[in-house]
Amino acid sequence: MKEIKDFEKIKIKIASPDQIRNWSYGEVKKSETINYRTLRPEKDGLFCERIFGTTKEWECYCGKFKSVRYKGIICDRCNVEVTHFKVRRERMGHIELAAPVAHIWYYKYIPSRIGLLLDITASSLNSILYYEKYVVIEPGDTDLKKMQLLNEDEYIEARERYGMSFNASMGAEAIKSLLENLDLDELSSKLRIQMIDKDDKTDKKLLRRLEIIENFKISGNKPEWMIMEVLPVIPPEIRPMVQLDGGRFATSDLNDLYRRVINRNNRLRKLLLLNAPEIIVRNEKRMLQESVDSLFDNSHKRKVVKGSSSRPLKSLSDALKGKQGRFRQNLLGKRVDYSGRSVIVVGPELKLHQCGLPAKMALELFKPFVIRRLIESEAVFNIKRAKNLIEQEVDEVWQILDLVIKEHPILLNRAPTLHRLGIQAFEPVLVEGKAIKLHPLVCHAYNADFDGDQMAVHVPLTPSAQAESWALMLSTNNLLNPANGHPIVFPSQDIVLGLYYLTMEKKNTVGEGKKFLNFNNVILAINNRSLDYNASIYVKIDGKYKKTTAGRVIFNEALPNGIEFVNKTLSDLELQILISKVYVVHGSSTVIEMLDIIKELGFKYATKFGCTISMSDIIVPDEKKAYIDRANKEIAKIQNDYAKGVITGEERYNNVVSVWLKTNEELTNKMMEILKKDRDGFNVIYMMADSGARGSRNQIRQLAGMRGLMAKTSGDIIELPIISNFKEGLSVIEFFISTNGARKGLADTALKTADAGYLTRRLVDIAQDVVVRIEDCGTINGIKVETVKNGEEILESLKEKAVGSYSIERIKNPITGEIVLDANEEISEAKIELLEKIGIEKLVIRSVLTCEAEHGVCQKCYGRDFSKNKPVNIGEAVGIIAAQSIGQPGTQLTMRTFHIGGVAQAGSEDDKISLKNTFILNGIEGFNVRVENGILFTRKGTLKIINVFYEEKIKNIKEIKVSDSQRVIKGIPLFVNNKGVEILSSYIGYVKLRDDKFLIVSEEQEVSLKAGTKLEIEVGEYVESGKVIGTFDPFAEPIIAEVKGKIKFKDIILGTTLKEEINTETGNVEKRITDNVFESLDPRIFIIDSGGVEIASYVLPGDAYLQVEDGQNINIGDIIAKLSKGSEKTQDITGGLPRVNDLFETRIPKNLTEMAKVSGIVQFKSIQKGKRLINILDEYGVEHKHYIPAGKHLLVRDGDIVKAGDMLCDGRINPHDVLEILGGISLQEFLLAEIQDVYRKQGVSINDKHIGVIIKQMMKKVKIVAVGDTNFVYGQKVDKHTFYEQNRKVIEQGGEPAIASPILIGVTKTSLNIDSFISAASFQETTKVLTDASIAGKIDDLRGLKENVVIGHLIPTGTGMGLYKKIKVSENVNSEV
């Protein structure tokens, strides 16, 4: 027998009638199933033994032959073959239909495939198939046209008029003959000519028709096979019928659907034999068509066929579709044997590689192994006795179980398994009771806690499975998080608290200030109680006395040898840094040893510390009242400004919210300060939060500060905060306001978890076939990486960005010229430090985004595997790792609201600008005007600054060894000071000699400023760090006069473009430009000079508040109008997850901006149809039109110079525009930055390469814009590699290649367009995918993981890769080389 695993590809086609008859073992003629008396299948029925095989093993139906020795004989009485009953799972039957029937997949699904081929609409097709209208097949020499539809009356009239000279009929027969008459080659060339004529405006329908025709041509399917003459009957075991206890039968819905088809078919046969009237026959044919439709797809019909309990019957399509369908329920999600589940409890005594397995559970799981050992040890001689012994649980059984379990790993899994660390291998240790014991340090990877969580246990059976569990899945081999390379096994909670207590320092305690010669003496002193754990002491280390504490000595004494002395108070972050450091320096074995020591110590000293918290530990600052009074005064002032009409309602609201956020922040800082001083830093609440063991600053703020601002149901912030804290107690109204946030948190958590899970599923689906397949793709392209900054603050260093990647270019030391980093060399931590030392801030590295491997990626472009901190192995499933790395935090982020209980969080904006570093202002860019005491930026501007790293007065210098403006790196001699000491540079930068100072400064940097910023410093000024250099209004964007003159309104008409609102609270009149768009009206303000000449014009966007009157005089710098920023909403990942979704689905954002298509000069034109036309004149004098909705706030003015890709108005950027205007690389950078931004705000670190893998998959296809001599169709979307391959062939033959442009496709769409139809079908829209695949005769190369899981092969990654399958063990050891 041929091994089922011997195939490498799967092809899907439409089955021809002959093929169906070929599969069949006989025709099903009756609709009976089982005889109710004998309970045996009826002859020729749906369960007939003659067709489908015997129901009893090795026995025919009548019982004449009963034994395996008659195997293969067909009984002469009952015609049943003597065989195994399992054949009833694989033998098919068929039904010969009395009239042809159309297959619902090909005519009903939109777009209708038959409709496209014949070019008729779906409704016309339906009317033909359901016998409502005739269609002309051959017009003969009449006036009728081919494919013309005739109703009953028209048909009779035509027959009377033309007699039999034309051919018209209805039903599936008519469609079948039309399909038979199609000449696909002729049709294809006709359509291609039409496509070329249409050129740019490709008709989607034309493209679809062409694609379908090409698919039929290539696949060898015949169009008429979409109409069925023979119906296959699937094997009976797949649609079983079983007897229930009460004697009734439960049957699969398919049997009911088949019965209806057979009954109607038999009735139609009889009617045809009887030559019944046409109308009756027609009705019966229509009913047959309907019954076959419901058999194939019942849910897709208007009138669904219902069963006895009026629930729709499950048809063949429904059995494939959805979560409960064949693909996802039975093929991708099988249940496995040798598994069990139980509640987990903590096992602090376990080693990192162990887990506790309940003895009863172990006995059940390892039963076959125990039975084998029992028989081998000759305690029993057959399996039955062995089972009895096991049930009696005799001593021998337990002894054998111990032997069996030794070094047999088991897998532990906790649902939801969000990333690969959700399943890890452990060595089992037998424990009493019924709960699984879990090591406390692996909880983080599983996201497990011990409040009733359950875990599943699986037993790997074969030696190779056990070897893989040991080598790859053991918990000690999974110390690092694959998403970012940070440790994922680290202490938390009690352990952290214990170590924090142990390593803290306390003043005035027993034994303070003593000196000790070695660690042992310290431990002796502690045991004799003459020394306190927290006492500050001196200990001799490496021949020198070092100031430390007794506790730290204990901690260091316990650590493995070779780790340098840790002399600080250990919080959770410090511990993680320590673990990382030890991992890099000493490797994993030392870390594993250290982790278990840390766990022991932590628990031990947490117990000794025995901390408790009481109300007296919660200290409310005495200054609280003063802070709140001050806030109330500020708010009164804001209210007063509002009453005078100085600020708008939105600004007032934003300012009030800002005041409370600031007050809360200050109060919290004060409170933390007091807690820190309380009991010399031993206030337990402070210790818990500071160590990171439990609780956060945010939670303590609610206990001892104030609860703060709360959010309304809408997400807006209520401007009156909850001033009380939990210690003081909340008033009734405060409590009531709190409830909404708390409830919302719980509801959100439930909804968002599903969202994040679905995101992960889509990502896995798009990236599942990305595997590292080759070592080097040989690309010369790479991407630029540099430090990510937000102003002064470094968000992500060059090290985080580039470490573990390979360099594209060779980098030399700018001073010595020696090669520091060669091309194609891995960038290690040491190399990065070297590069930073010589001042390299940008690198071009190889990236998955630019990898040119045909399938998957190559080792060099992927770089380092973060879970191992080594270069990635060939065969690593990097696509799935990427999907998990992005999806897993998504699920975590959704849980955020849950813990803080709905307290509003929004960044409070300051209205002052100051920079952290000392700097020199080199220059300014952007429109600005001089006003008294400063410079006012009328639009967005930029400061060009150079930071000052180092300064020394020249009078203190004896000799300068460098020249002005020279670039220096660390370690270069700068000067000799007056004391004769040579000073070396500890910075990278440029020398600047200024007045009486010697400076080292940075390269020029840019700081962007908002419109309306008033700058209070001059160009060239030397500015100390922290000095306020300017102010701006954070809650409104002003439109500012740049010239002096008189105001003149244009198209500002009260009631049309201008709305006057009387504010009910203040009685002031607010003038607001409406955001309704009028065809011809374009509200503007002109400034005219004394001669009435227009010298400036300002376009007013919708919702702008006017600050001037018509005819009023205006000075430079006065505000003409202002735009309020929308009210503050709370920033939560609720904003984050949908944003990530939109980016991955490449949805066009709602509030779109328009980007400049080219670089050039802006020219304002008229408003047409509610859109403003803006032309950009490029350098060749060509005008490029841009249409912008009229109410939008413009970011450019007439005559401005813009660069391609600049935003012309405010709004969100559309990724498709980025691709079109700036190209593929810019789009990749844009998507990467946007997605990272969402995660970074939540404090989640994901390496760029994971997001890169997904973006690479989204940009896999190109769109054909010129066909050349290839077989492509204009406007068709094809895979990049297919495109290059076809072009290569055409060029070799001297033809003209096709031209294509890159496109971006969202993840869902990409998953459905994936090459593998099995993978796409198991994702979504199963029936549609299979319909298209069958027409195209698609071949699945079984390249991805999913398709191999579905058909039961090993997945082609890791050890299952083709590369490793061919490895043979050689017998001959001493063979000649």
From Swiss-Prot:
UniProt keyword terms in alphabetical order: DNA-directed RNA polymerase, Magnesium, Metal-binding, Nucleotidyltransferase, Transcription, Transferase, Zinc
Residues bound to Zn(2+) 2: C777, C851, C858, C861
GO cellular component terms given for this protein: DNA-directed RNA polymerase complex
Domain of life of the organism encoding this protein: Bacteria
Record SUPFAM superfamilies: beta and beta-prime subunits of DNA dependent RNA-polymerase (SSF64484)
Catalytically driven reaction(s): RNA(n) + a ribonucleoside 5'-triphosphate = RNA(n+1) + diphosphate
Residues noted as binding Mg(2+) in the record, renumbered to the chain: D449, D451, D453
Assembly mode: The RNAP catalytic core consists of 2 alpha, 1 beta, 1 beta' and 1 omega subunit. When a sigma factor is associated with the core the holoenzyme is formed, which can initiate transcription.
Function according to Swiss-Prot or TrEMBL: DNA-dependent RNA polymerase catalyzes the transcription of DNA into RNA using the four ribonucleoside triphosphates as substrates.
Protein's name according to its UniProt entry: DNA-directed RNA polymerase subunit beta'
